[in-house]
């Protein structure tokens, strides 16, 4: 059966019963129908919980993805089945990838979060609220320039873009304000996808409604004719934008097929944003659970690094254990096998591709945290391939455990769950890759590129070099950095698979996200508005006269 067929046959528990498992009363949730709810921001921590945090990340994936969310959900179910009270905390999907290449982002097989259709499509309206808030701010900025423009905002240096929750390459570069004096001031701008917006990052890093408003007020929208930054707070727009987002700030509660409480909230991409669900979602899960399992987008070089160097600084807690998801398919792909041949045994390609997994292991070990590798099982895997991965990981003093969450749900993930509990109780000495206060922006970027990606050197474009100087002048050197790069490679070139060395990492531009609290570095040709593939997932979706959807996988 397909994912959506499995989800359609599931018997869901009322969301009030799921809330009860977390000690939440009906007064502490706001129901969105029978099976979805938002959690009140003032929920108090339960004192008798262990508050253990498990981070699930992965190796560099194939274009189809490697089932990280599936393993995450299976692990959460397995822990509960073994009587370790657990909550899952994960990101909510963007409709761009849902209708583009992924077709859905709520796990797969018998490890899914439900109601699957609702979560993948409009859910509780968080992304719509973010889109509206973002574009309201854009409209306010354009109106300000058209009217008196008391702060002398330079229309050529407005960096705030509009957003849409779609993959629409035609909107990457646009001209607004055409049509004469009453239509505004003409200027070049563009659209980003909502998941890459600063407001998405702010929503995911805010710790309260007050913090949300403070962060929004710090957003830099552009520069004056004297090249001085102008913030939302200086324009006095922060309260209006906060009002639009006040409900979206509340975490969303749903369930897995096995009725594990799951908090799904916030959805920044890991390649063009920081790739982690909201701090409030993770903190709420930690407050109410013995174990919280959460994920970071794409590979450990992207979401993993950003969780540990960006989100952790706000959350104030590091993971007690890290799970790196690997597949035979992705390792063979990183070892040079063609996409069309990934269902065939290829031990030579697998051996070469192990360099990718080994680098991710060593990278996560730099943070001083215990690690286990989860081999996400595919039906095409052979015993020889599985054993090769286990043997190679053993040489790194890391255990690799076969999981079958897609076919068996939590029951296929018990061995991994037991290992995670063991690791979470082991001692660790967490450290960051860079010192956020001591290292300047350039040093931070170079440390990530060299220590995590394996680069020999970092090349900054002339534009990026000038921005480094200006950002230092503005006092932004003490912020974390968020590198936007391809998810398929350690380099900025998606064709360089495996574990390249002796390469130059290219940074072309810096983007200040002062409200979010970091500076984005755009590497290679990375774009913040994706496009659709040749055959979008949308063309294979159907809905009948009764509203039944097929093709959403």
Curated annotation (Swiss-Prot):
Disulphide connectivity of cysteines: none
Q: Which family does it belong to?
A: Belongs to the formate--tetrahydrofolate ligase family.
User: Could you identify this protein by its name?
Assistant: Formate--tetrahydrofolate ligase
Query: Which EC number applies?
Result: 6.3.4.3
Q: Which gene is the coding source of this polypeptide chain?
A: fhs
Q: Tell me the InterPro entries matching this sequence.
A: Formate_THF_ligase, Formate_THF_ligase_CS, P-loop_NTPase
Q: What top-level class of enzyme does the UniProt entry assign?
A: ligase
Q: Where does ATP bind?
A: 62-69
Reaction catalysed by this enzyme: (6S)-5,6,7,8-tetrahydrofolate + formate + ATP = (6R)-10-formyltetrahydrofolate + ADP + phosphate
UniProt xrefs under Gene3D superfamilies: Domain 2, N(10)-formyltetrahydrofolate synthetase (3.30.1510.10), Formyltetrahydrofolate synthetase, domain 3 (3.10.410.10), P-loop containing nucleotide triphosphate hydrolases (3.40.50.300)
Q: In which pathway does it act?
A: One-carbon metabolism; tetrahydrofolate interconversion
- The answer on whether this UniProt entry bears the keyword Nucleotide-binding reads yes
* SUPFAM superfamilies membership: P-loop containing nucleoside triphosphate hydrolases
Pfam families under this entry?
Answer: FTHFS (PF01268)
């Amino acid at each position: 059966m397909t994912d959506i067929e499995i989800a359609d046959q599931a018997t869901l528990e009322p969301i009030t019963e799921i809330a009860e498992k977390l000690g939440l009363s009906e007064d502490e949730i706001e129901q969105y129908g029978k099976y979805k709810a938002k959690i009140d921001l003032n929920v108090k921590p339960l004192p008798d919980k262990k508050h253990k945090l498990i981070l699930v990340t992965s190796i560099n994936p194939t274009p189809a993805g490697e089932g990280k969310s599936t393993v995450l959900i299976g692990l959460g179910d397995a822990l509960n089945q073994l009587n370790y009270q657990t909550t899952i905390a994960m990101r909510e999907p963007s409709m761009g990838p849902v209708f583009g290449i992924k077709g859905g982002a709520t796990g797969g097989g018998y490890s899914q979060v439900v109601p699957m259709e609702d979560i993948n499509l409009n859910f509780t309206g968080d992304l719509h609220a973010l889109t509206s808030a973002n574009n309201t701010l854009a409209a306010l900025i354009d109106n300000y320039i058209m009217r008196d423009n008391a702060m002398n905002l330079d229309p050529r240096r407005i960096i705030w873009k509009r957003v849409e929750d779609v993959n629409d390459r035609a909107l990457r570069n646009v001209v607004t304000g055409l049509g004469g004096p009453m239509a505004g001031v003409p200027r070049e701008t563009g659209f980003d996808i909502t998941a890459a917006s600063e407001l998405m990052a702010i929503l995911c890093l805010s710790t309260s409604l007050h913090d949300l408003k403070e962060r929004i007020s710090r957003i830099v929208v552009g520069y004056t004719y004297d090249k001085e930054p102008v913030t939302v707070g200086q324009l006095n727009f922060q309260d209006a934008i906060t009002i639009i987002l006040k409900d979206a700030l509340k975490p969303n509660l749903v369930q897995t097929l096995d009725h594990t409480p799951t908090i799904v909230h916030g959805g920044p991409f890991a390649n063009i944003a920081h790739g982690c669900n909201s701090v409030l979602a993770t903190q709420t899960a930690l407050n109410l659970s013995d174990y919280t399992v959460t994920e970071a987008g794409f590979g450990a070089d992207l979401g993993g690094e950003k969780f540990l160097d960006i989100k952790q600084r706000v959350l104030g807690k590091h993971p007690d254990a890290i799970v790196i998801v690997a597949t035979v398919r992705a390792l063979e792909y990183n070892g040079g096998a063609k996409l069309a041949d990934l269902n065939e045994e290829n031990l030579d390609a697998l051996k070469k591709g192990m360099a990718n997994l080994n680098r991710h292991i060593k990278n996560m070990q730099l943070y001083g945290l215990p690690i286990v590798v989860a081999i996400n099982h595919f039906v095409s895997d052979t015993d020889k391939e599985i054993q090769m991965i286990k043997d190679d990981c053993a040489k790194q003093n890391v255990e690799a455990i076969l999981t079958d969450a897609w076919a068996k749900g939590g029951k296929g993930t018990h061995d991994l769950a037991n290992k995670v509990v063991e690791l979470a109780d082991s001692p660790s000495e967490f450290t960051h890759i860079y010192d956020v206060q001591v290292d300047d922006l350039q040093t931070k970027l170079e440390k990530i590129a060299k220590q995590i990606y394996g680069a020999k050197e970092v090349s900054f474009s002339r534009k990026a070099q000038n921005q480094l100087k200006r950002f230092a002048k503005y006092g932004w050197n003490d912020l974390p950095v968020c590198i936007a790069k391809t998810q398929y490679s350690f380099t900025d070139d998606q064709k360089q698979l495996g574990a390249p060395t002796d390469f130059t990492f290219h940074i072309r531009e810096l983007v200040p996200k002062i409200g979010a609290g970091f500076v984005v570095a755009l590497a290679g040709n990375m774009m913040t508005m994706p496009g659709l593939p040749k055959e979008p997932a949308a063309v294979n979706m159907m809905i009948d006269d009764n509203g039944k959807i097929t093709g959403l996988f």
